[in-house]
Amino acid sequence: MFYPLFSLLIGLSLSQSLYNYQSSNVYNATWMSNLDNGIPIREMSIIGSHSSMGTGTGGWAFKTQSNSLMNQMMIGMRALDIRCRHYRNGFSIHDRFVYLNTDLQGVLDTVRSFLSSYPMETILMHIVEEYDASGNSQSFEDTYLSYQASNSDLIWTPTSQNPVLGEVRGKIVIIQDFPARGIHGLLYTTFTVLPHKYFNTNWDQYDKWTAVKSFLGATNSAGKSRISFWTGHGGSFPYFVASGKSSPGNGDPRLSTALTTPGFKKWYPDFPRVACFIGICTIAFEGINILAYNYLNDQGYTYLGIVFTNFVG
């Protein structure tokens, strides 16, 4: 049984806020309460935030979200991407070398507060090691276990690799993306994953889009256990990958590819043609969020998998 994808996207207000560089006040905090307890988590379509704590520290290159962690959950995000630097036997939250001004316990406390108010929801939490470890006397797994032990009422204890929603309501389900002796959640290696992309330039955007587009089709056919990152960094800012814009403001224009039609009409066929005059149109970039949403609606797909993206709200 698949949760209707179109309803999910509308419920998350993506139709109005495919890209939002401002904090949102559109909330959808209880959407899971409408779902049957018997739905397997792996068969649900779930929108999540990439580098969930990247709300501004480090500037444009590291800003990935316009909403606080609590607001992300309030607007309907149910998958969090938490990148942990192993430092002095604790987990500080990083995006590459940039410390994001919190630690894992701070993240867990915020999620606890949300789930105590909305116990019919569940939060998937992708935990992965980030940046260089330093000052530790134990393994990454041992440090994780210390957090798990002190939050045992909050973090789901795995009984299988295919839990249903009713088993995990009010809980955090860890997506375990780190080497370990034990199993502490859903193993990342049991999912088929479209990874985050390094961009050399903005012109890598179309390659990223074609990878996302192909993955969405395969995901719908597979029907379970798929994770995709609609994101990129490097020679492009995260806001550009999400929006295709020349600068991050909600009302700012799309960036031009510097190509025009009709001369380059076969190039970038899914990108918009804008500013047309006497038969000549500029080919503009488009954001992955917008391209994916429009494509999903056109295709009528029923399964999206778990998506991590930026600036939805």
Feature-to-residue mapping (PLM):
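Active-site-adjacent pocket scaffolds in enzyme catalytic domains
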Residues: 141-234
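Short, solvent-exposed polar/charged micro-motifs at secondary-structure junctions
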Residues: 54-56, 134-138, 164-165, 237-239
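Loop/turn elements at helix/coil->beta-strand transitions in domains of secreted/extracellular proteins
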Residues: 75-80, 118-124, 150-153, 168-172, ...
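Short His-Asn-centered micro-motif
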Residues: 82, 126-129, 175-177, 201, ...
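Cleavable N-terminal signal peptides of Sec/SRP-targeted secreted and luminal proteins
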Residues: 2-15
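Metal-dependent phosphodiesterase/phospholipase catalytic core, i.e.
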Residues: 85-89, 94-161
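Long, acidic (Asp/Glu-rich), low-complexity accessory segments flanking structured domains
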Residues: 15-79, 88-122, 180-189, 233-313
